[in-house]
Amino acid sequence: MKNKLLARVARLGGLSSALLLAGCELDVLDPKGPVGEGVKTLIATSTVAMLIVVIPTILETLLFAWQYRQSNTSAEYLPKWCHSNKIEVTIWGVPSLIILFLAVITYQTCHSLDPYKPLEAEANTKPLHVEVVALDWKWLFIYPEQGIATVNQLAIPVNTPIDFNITSDSVMNSFFIPRLGSMIYAMAGMQTQLHLLASEPGDYLGESANYSGRGFSDMKFHTLAVSGDEFNAWVEKVKSSSEQLDSQTYPKLAAPSENPVEYFAHVEPGMFNTIVAKYNNGMVMDKSTGKMIQVQQSAMSDMNMKE
């Protein structure tokens, strides 16, 4: 009776788990951009290659258990057997070839999907530059060319390369849009880069992939992939906001909070560099020369430079 009850509980638990897992979305396996497609291909290829070892091993284990079960008195008994060249070649050779194969495709994919590598675009398509700042517990997006900024909402035109510059004004975080591709760290005083492209319109969830405190679980944002005209209309919508982001208003935004979507019609020029320089004694790297340059001292003092 007790065994039957345990079996029923186990079956019910298994069915419940399957039902719950059915509600999970595997965004990484439903990519909407070339980088995401490359990641998906690598995952699928690696999984199939590993199953070449896993499936035969499971089948052989089941076959061995059946063949040499206690009731099978006709099974051949070889108490002095100790070696087989065929078995040795198989169990060492096949996995070694698979590991070599995985090493080659992983190396090739990692270099082809290098987050610092600019993406190819259609003729006359200019990349969009976005500066990203990880805060507690929200994301700040600065559009330097448009002179605007948003919190927890990122809009990008479809089929346009997006060049991200990423930093943090708090602990280390990870910037990740699963359906578009690569994840990369956001670190205080440093600038990391990421190049992505959305090949289809949609609303794609972005998130932090690093635990960073109490509000981490809600540190998400929406990525709106829209047409060029819709993007221009969105920019005008942001510019109609009455809010501005400068050295006076930024400290309030940077304070720990879980902000909803917020628009800033104007951003103080050089805001991103000022944030990075807070952790580098007022210095920031000039991308064109690779040299460290000094950020304006007035902006640094207004933002309460951290040691």
Curated annotation (Swiss-Prot):
Annotated GO CC locations: plasma membrane
Bilayer topology term: Multi-pass membrane protein
Residues with lipid group (N-palmitoyl cysteine): 24
GO-annotated biological processes: ATP synthesis coupled electron transport
InterPro entries assigned: CcO_II, CcO_II-like_C, COX_ARM, Cupredoxin, CuRO_UO_II, Cyt_c_oxidase_su2_TM_dom, Cyt_c_oxidase_su2_TM_sf, Cyt_o_ubiquinol_oxidase_su2
Ranges annotated as spanning the membrane: 46-66, 87-107
Matches recorded under Pfam families: COX2, COX_ARM
Single GO MF annotation: cytochrome bo3 ubiquinol oxidase activity
Gene symbol of the encoding locus: cyaB
Protein known as: Ubiquinol oxidase subunit 2
Gene3D superfamilies for this protein: 1.10.287.90, Cupredoxins - blue copper proteins
EC number(s) given by UniProt: 1.10.3.-
Lipid attachment points (S-diacylglycerol cysteine): 24
